[in-house]
Amino acid sequence: MSKQILWKDSWQAIPRSFGRFIAISLLMLLGTFAFIGLKITGPDMRQTALDFFKQNNLADVTVTSTYGLDQTDQQTIKDQVGVRQVTFGYYQDAAINHSQTSIRVYSNTKQISKYQLVSGKRPTKANEIALSTSLQGKYKLGQTINLGHTTELKNQKFKVVGFVKSSEYVSRTDYGQTNVGTGQLSGIAVTTKNAFNATNYNIARVTYRATKRMNAYSDRYNEYTDDKKTQLQTALNKLRAPKYQNYQSQITTAQNQVTQLEQAASANPAFQTQLSQAQAQLTSTENNLKNLGYPSYTVSTRSSFPGYSVYRSNSRRVDVLANVFPVFLFIIAALVSLTTMMRFVKEERITIGTFSALGYSHRDISLKFILYSIMSSGIGVLLGAIGGFTILPQIVFKAYAASSTISGLQLHFSWTYLLIVIAVALCSTTLAALYALRKDYQEHPASLLLPKPPKAGSKILLERFTPLWRHLSFNYKVTFRNLFRYKSRALMTIFGVAGCVGLLVMGIGIRDSLSGIISKQYETIIKYDLIVAQKAAPIETESQSYQKLLNSDKVRRHQAIYTQQFNKIAGSDQSTQTITMIVPANQKHFNKFVNLLSPSGQELSLPKNGVILTQKMADLLKAKKGSQVSLKDANGQSHHFKVMGIAQMYMGHYLFMSRSAYEQSFKTNYQTNAQLVTLKHNSSKQVKKVAQSFIRTGAVTTTSLNLENQQLIANVINGLNTVIVVLIAIATILAMVVLYNLTNINVSERIRGLSTIKVLGFFDREVTMYIYRETIILTTLGILFGYLFGYGLHAFIMINLPPDNAMFDDSMYPLNFLISTIIPCLITLGLAFIMHRKIRDVDMLEALKSVD
């Protein structure tokens, strides 16, 4: 039998129902775009970073020491089991042209943690320097910069010959702290080893043989490097006491020389000059030794490199969103597509009967629906996959790239995600159509040539409430009858609208939660502008300058504190968390600097015994009031604390103690080592200026500016905001397509009924409202259920989205629900005008005779 007519009818079905065809394509496009795009972005970001690290042979571990690395230190590092390569180098912090721009100057390395040249050339002479790309806007190639007087560098003036990227500094905004300039590094620089004066190296970079075959973002790699870090730290700690004794013996020798010179000078005044020089040298050495304290070694894994963990966390935040938003979005799109295809089969009932009566096989008749479903869903999947694999990852990466040195996202293809999408598309369109056809094929061709008889009439639940039913108008009685008559379509409309509204509530809610973090953290909780860390033994003139600045009119108030950092392995990836302990000297006015609030918002005061731990750390440790927590200090010694309260803190981990609790816990006398400072004018320019003034007193080792912390938070928020805006846009478009599709199905199903009441004399507006009243009721129910759905999704995301060192504001604001209501309402209103025109232009007689 010739299939020409069958093929012709199959192809003509597309233009005959082009709106339905486009709707299915759009649904599949949106679902595929969001699903593939978000699922592939996280892996793309991580693989791009891994390739960057591999290309530059990023160190697995770095070692620095307050006393430098002598031959014994170097040999100890080389002798560690599993070491593949070790390189040693120098670094020195300096301020450019005596400005607020501080940089860390490194000696060039050609093996480990290589510097990637972006423009210009690498320095080859002792007076040449290459700056990090973060400084590219401030300085130009060929420009001469002055790094001031530093004992570690041979030259003060350097010629800028290039701009580089360092794989050890993934962040473009966070370079760490320093004791020059404002106390915050603005970038790094590279010069030759010959440019340094130092006798001992002060940084070692180490790679291990086993890590060459590991994924650097895997738990296996983290566990391995943490283990190697512990081994190396233990080995180096054994050298601390001998090194300190060696320096003490040098001081003793110098003291003996001074004593001898004093005796010589008393006999011969000619030795007086030598005596003065020796005394000055001795005093300087003693002060330096006191400020340096006991020798310490800092062994760091990649997780401690500036921006390394943040970048990984950013990519994993995308993974969290990818496991929620696109999955639900795709489910909604698939279910609506399923409903649409099943309705398409119902509309083609008579055509199916005609072809069946003409002798065409069920397989031949099914060809039309297979072709239609594959074409409509296939176009959507194809376009969505192209955009998902190429466009969406670039949009997300671009948002994060502004604060990262990693550039040039490497796009990857995934058969797994594509096959999942194809399977869902086929199930929701092709299989749905074949399932609906299966029922029709069970009927005789003669019965298929007649419309399917309606279900037997029955009372709806509302009719049993007689007093209420009597007071309803005819229009509302018809509306409620139809709602209960077409239950599956009504439920699908409610589900579709609820899903879209839920995604909007979640998306806008996340955006609100992110936007409120900075104000809550740095206006409600933390009220100081900077922390100033003091030297252990400043000379008298330095102390005087320092106290004078503290009491100047630039400072509104200040609070002496003792601060120390602890570590704890915790979190989803069992990474090292840093906890900052703050112990104020004066507890009475501490709330003017840090406002301690419980999770419920009640004010907390420092307990006489025990500590107050911030909320996120308490969650990671599953600690509550009365729990014992164990933390390690920089030397690996464990300390145990009893939690007496839990306080809000949105970024970072903190532990607060009273003075008496500190002395009781550490068995030592309390002594301050820093100041919390609140300025009268806290503009960005003023804060940096005052921070620089503190550094210049000579009594300060470093400063920590809240401005820098706010910038780090802003970078995270901006990246997530871009993702959320894209998701909100997709959810809005999905709502439009879903509502249009379901409303169109509703009108198509009821075209005979609409024609009937139109013939009976109903006005166009009444005819439209006859059917659109149902849409309004179903949309309203969908919006209400969407609130609950969105609230649950938002709560889930707020638990899983933040990194281990942060907590998001989980509040839901009325404006969120208002916007999430207005969007579907506007779409419904817009569709009302479209459907009104469609219903108005219906050929009533044609519609009424179409099934005869």
Range-by-range predicted roles:
Residues 117-193, 202-203, 207-214, 602-660:
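Hydrophobic secondary-structure segments that place a key small or acidic residue at a functional site
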